[in-house]
């Protein structure tokens, strides 16, 4: 999964970046997912690949800016495609029955969601084109390092941010005591 979702995108970029740097312009659009914002039981490896792409893209923003090249990681929510259908999803070949209790709700939820996803692929594609070409609704906007795509993506990302903020707040008094004594607060 990392070979396709992460290293595949890196290989394509490695092939086109020399000419983009030479022309001092362009846009890099990597494909992430809302899965890159939280680990989901039964989808941890997929989520990890999408998180890796997002963080890699954030680094690219700084690395490519001196060349006039922008980078963004498009993070779609669920779009009504065959992505969740039998022949398109990766399933563990040697599933561990003892993990079923932790993963069954995810598998059942994704199966029920198949062909009921809220996102319209044509509308999503239009937003992507407008964002990358800075036309239409995206005229005059700067591309963010991570571009959520879809109402469900925005909702899921906000929930992930809130969970992380809550964890920071709850543990701040414990984890901030690690500085050397000669370091000022």
Regions flagged by a language model, labelled:
Residues 13, 49:
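Active-site helix of classical SDR
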Residues 38, 59-70:
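Active-site-adjacent segment of SDR/Rossmann-fold oxidoreductases
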Residues 33:
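Residue(s) in the substrate-gating loop at a strand-loop-helix junction
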Residues 38-44:
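Active-site loop immediately N-terminal to the catalytic Tyr-X3-Lys motif
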Residues 66-142:
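SDR active-site lid
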């Amino acid at each position: 999964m990392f070979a396709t979702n992460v290293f595949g995108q890196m290989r394509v970029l490695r092939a086109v970046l020399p000419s983009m740097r030479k022309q001092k312009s362009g846009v890099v659009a990597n494909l992430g997912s809302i899965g890159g914002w939280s680990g989901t039981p039964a989808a941890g490896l997929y989520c990890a690949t999408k998180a890796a792409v997002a963080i890699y893209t954030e680094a690219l923003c700084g690395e490519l800016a001196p060349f006039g090249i922008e980078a963004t990681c498009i993070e779609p929510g669920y779009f009504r495609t065959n992505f969740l259908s039998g022949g398109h999803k990766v399933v563990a070949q040697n599933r561990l029955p003892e993990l079923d209790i932790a993963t069954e709700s995810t598998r059942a939820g994704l199966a029920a969601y198949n062909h009921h996803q809220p996102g319209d692929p044509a509308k999503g594609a239009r937003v992507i084109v407008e964002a990358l070409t800075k036309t239409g609704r995206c005229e005059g906007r700067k591309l963010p390092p991570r571009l959520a795509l879809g109402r469900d993506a925005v909702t899921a990302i906000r929930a992930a941010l809130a969970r992380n903020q809550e964890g920071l707040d709850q543990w701040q008094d414990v984890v901030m005591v690690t500085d050397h004594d000669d370091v000022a607060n």
